[in-house]
Amino acid sequence: MSIHPFDSAIELAHEAPDRWHGRTSEDYWNMVSPYGGATAGAMMQAMLRHPERRGTPLSFTLNFLAPIERGEFAIDTELVRANRNSQHWAVRLAQGGKVLAQAIAICATRRETWGKVEAERPDVPPAEQCAVAPPRKPDGFLQRYEFRIVRGKPFAVN
């Protein structure tokens, strides 16, 4: 079985309990830096693989401080505080010793509870009746998507 390009993009090598190494992926390269979802995925992957992590992620807030260059990067994870049911994490991505992205996350052991979400599909025509938008930039992760415009002009005030 072949590995999905996203799994390759967030693949990390473990150096120490709190340190991971990865490499940017051309498959998820955006205009000046990697697609934010690939960066967030790699950073969350480091936290999820940490030997002290318990529970599942409840929140993950990522701040991009500067563009990430093509090539290798390091991710450091820090368990800032833990109690019986939750953990608070800090995750930092750096290149050349400079932090370029930082995240805070909360993981928790979920308890069984009642919940109900009511959502309705918006009133739109079938996809095949919508015009295909031309790609803005034919590289990286945008090649994986076909954008269809329901109404208005893309990238213009409607």
Regions found by a protein language model. Give the residues of each.
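Terminal targeting signals and extreme-terminal segments of soluble enzymes
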Residues: 1-158
